[in-house]
Amino acid sequence: MENEAAVFKVLADPTRLRLMVLLSIQGETCVCKLAEALNAPDFKISRHLGIMRSAGLVEARREGTWMHYKLSDARSKLEKCLQQCFGECLATHTTVKADLKRLSKANCK
């Protein structure tokens, strides 16, 4: 139960929950685009993604100066269920719709 509790602890933060939803819908995405989507500075998004990475929820890939993140493969039935729910259940949430709209217009500089 410790691993499951740790997942919920990480996702209890609204910013990290929004990041999980965006990554479940959009797939691999650059930090700068995620920052634009959430109207937050890059360093704040990077910090949240670092916490999520430490918990095994996301993976990172460097491309030059850019860091790209995607959801990790689910390690348990719980994680698989949550990933599906993020993409299906929360995609129509008002906040997520606004995030997706900003994400579609985001442009790394």
Language-model regions, residue ranges each:
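Beta-hairpin "wing" of winged helix-turn-helix
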Residues: 54-63, 70-71
